[in-house]
Curated annotation (Swiss-Prot):
Primary localisation category: cytoplasm
Keyword Transmembrane appears in the UniProt entry: no
Family listed: Belongs to the chaperonin (HSP60) family.
Subunit and interaction comment: Forms a cylinder of 14 subunits composed of two heptameric rings stacked back-to-back. Interacts with the co-chaperonin GroES.
Reactions this protein catalyses: ATP + H2O + a folded polypeptide = ADP + phosphate + an unfolded polypeptide
An individual GO BP term: chaperone cofactor-dependent protein refolding
EC number(s) given by UniProt: 5.6.1.7
Residue ranges, annotated region (Disordered): 522-542
Name of the gene encoding the protein in the UniProt record: groEL
Recorded superkingdom: Bacteria
GO cellular component assignments: GroEL-GroES complex
Protein name: Chaperonin GroEL
Amino acid sequence: MAKDIKFSEDARRAMLRGVDQLANAVKVTLGPKGRNVVLEKKFGSPLITNDGVTIAKEIELEDPFENMGAKLVSEVASKTNDVAGDGTTTATVLAQAMIQEGLKNVTAGANPVGVRRGIEKAVATAIEELKAISKPIESKESIAQVAAISSGDEEVGKLIAEAMERVGNDGVITIEESKGFATELDVVEGMQFDRGYTSPYMVTDSDKMEAVLEKPYILITDKKINNIQEILPVLEQVVQQGRPMLIIAEDVEGEAQATLVLNKLRGTFNVVAVKAPGFGDRRKAMLEDIAILTGGQVITEDLGLELKTATVDQLGTANKVVVTKDDTTIVEGAGDSTQISARVNQIRAQMEETTSEFDREKLQERLAKLAGGVAVVKVGAATETELKERKLRIEDALNSTRAAVEEGIVAGGGTALVSIYNKVAALEAEGDVETGINIVLRSLEEPVRQIAHNAGLEGSVIVERLKHEAVGVGFNAANGEWVNMIDAGIVDPTKVTRSALQNASSVAALLLTTEAVVADKPDENGPAAVPDMGMGGMGGMM
């Protein structure tokens, strides 16, 4: 296919048009008085959102050169979303400001490579300063404030703070759609996995159809149990202790299952069998997790262990186990806290190394089950359109809160970026490197300018006053007052602000140093006509 090539000024101008179209659509959502954007969906009702990355991903431009510019900025939003989970609109605003200022200077004769060095130098200093002014997040109130600012809803803030308090910072918090109107929180404490009892005759509460075992022994194996003789020795030891038993195995079937059910119904002993969670290597890892949590051993041939020689000492224990037809919950496993901590650190290290998003998600789930529990935020709304919009906002708020716990918080509303202005301005440089630093300085003002603009005010006036205010004092666009941002609960996670600045500068520097752009040439003749299949003379067929 023939290619269309544009060089230097033409290339950069075409890409800038794309950057502007995407950024202008995204930046109207910034701040407490930001507006929504409606996205057409081929099926179903349109999506109404103020989430920057969702809008950016939907934009596809007709001109291939403009589209390349738009896609570059869309990547800024996506990358910021991947790393920090929020701040995508801020990242887009920063990228647009840097690209616009940079192109003005490059067009006027500045060397793009020198400008790039200046941008990198300024951003490195800005990030150091952000870390220096960052405050750790400690109280439940602070967590609620971060979530409320991100979602624009105080109730959501309280809900997420409650969830994080209940399951801990490492706990899994999932967001699901509710069937009702209310948004509520459901917390599962302890380790839960999605496998239920192998026979309904094992239940202890026939009304709720669940089996509740108090202080049970837990046999963990990756083998299939067909013959009761295999587990008879350990079963007899448990019966002598007069305690219930949970068996986690690949499967329990045939004669073994029948014998267990029969003895359960006769009241000889209380035992429940469940299938092991997961598949393949992941199953082995999850069984090992359960063993560490309950202080037991996995009876597996990999370790040279056999079921018929297993003893009570190799079994795990827990305060309580609840088994339903769909899942099993182990509450307060009796494992050694040092071993559990070591396992948690091992899983964390695996999360850092893995490149697969799916694997990372599964590792995060395992981490949560060991470290805390699982909280489910059930999102309710009156209509499907409102439900989708609300769910997106709550996801952003959750990501924002996690980022705040990780790296702390800075003053919100773009205030932190302006407060580091003087430190960046103090950098010594000359020529094109100085030009690069000035480009970053101009972009640091842009989020405040845009927040003020969206609130119907003159951004430049707000920025100038902000530069002369005391550190931490900023403009609250929600009510038009000048307040101490952190005291007023208007905060941004440091990680979100840092990621936005890093990703914006990275793409801006790349675009400024672009000298040629290659795109497919559109086919001027349009698609070829369908050829005549020579069946014109067959009209007499019935």
